[in-house]
């Protein structure tokens, strides 16, 4: 009998072991679709980004015009740009849902997989930030100025660090050039990290909604989950195309239709919607260094998830109190997102401060306490 090429060829063997003959728990739900959706997002973003880079000029005098030229004169340039801009939003929707799933079902107990995932999130955030600066509109320029300026809060080396990042004494041509270089490079770094993420995942196999070992009931990834993923792809591509074609500027800021002007500050400087929760936490502390530390902590706190797990059960499936707390946390994040988009005035200031405090309290104090209480209740 001839050898099966899929199982013997050095390259195809790797593909086979991770996409075809991969033993998968039979009971994983649609919440497990987001990993492959993130892969699809990454491929879409790299493809559209590459096509956009072919028509982009990384120069302060030409960047804004080159983007306008792409939209007006390049075949389907408007569509490529709209897919790329809104694709970023879908990327973040998917990654936030993916993290939420991991948090709910205790997937963070696969420490290496979880930690590489958090590093992936940080890299994605950096990529989105530098990418937002490239069209060189008002919000691009002022967003870059405000966020890079945060590094000056670092004692002793802060100011030097900021000027080194800027390549001068303000956000200018060198900044734009290096941001373009970084925006081109980072997605490939994300692709590399994704392979590491998957390597660690395939060491242990997937978690499942029950949080118990599924070794006794595994099914091949193909055709079962390849088909299920394909449905997921369709369900994500449909709204993405709808948004890109019918309402491409819905999630953008109108300020970015004005070319960057260092002499005019926009009335409300705010990032894209997917950074608003962190921006609200940053603003809720009336001290520069304190705000920066809280901003960093709001994302880096994910690294602590495995250490804050005190429950005897892995998932929240059979833990009603933790479930309640989880959904309060989700609501709290939505409130933070909303507050981040509002001006800095009463009552938004106090709402933001309460929501920020609640965010850290739930994660650091209430989750471990609730888990301990649930453990106690199991003994009765």
From Swiss-Prot:
Heme b b562 binds at residues 84, 183. Its cofactor is heme b. It is found in: Mitochondrion inner membrane. It comes from the Eukaryota. Keywords: Electron transport, Heme, Iron, Membrane, Metal-binding, Mitochondrion, Mitochondrion inner membrane, Respiratory chain, Transmembrane, Transmembrane helix, Transport, Ubiquinone. A ubiquinone binds at residue 202. The chain crosses the membrane at residues 34-54, 78-99, 114-134, 179-199, 227-247, 289-309, 321-341, 348-368. Heme b b566 binds at residues 98, 197. PANTHER family: CYTOCHROME B (PTHR19271:SF16). This is Cytochrome b. It comes from Amazilia tzacatl (Rufous-tailed hummingbird). The lineage of its organism: Eukaryota, Metazoa, Chordata, Craniata, Vertebrata.
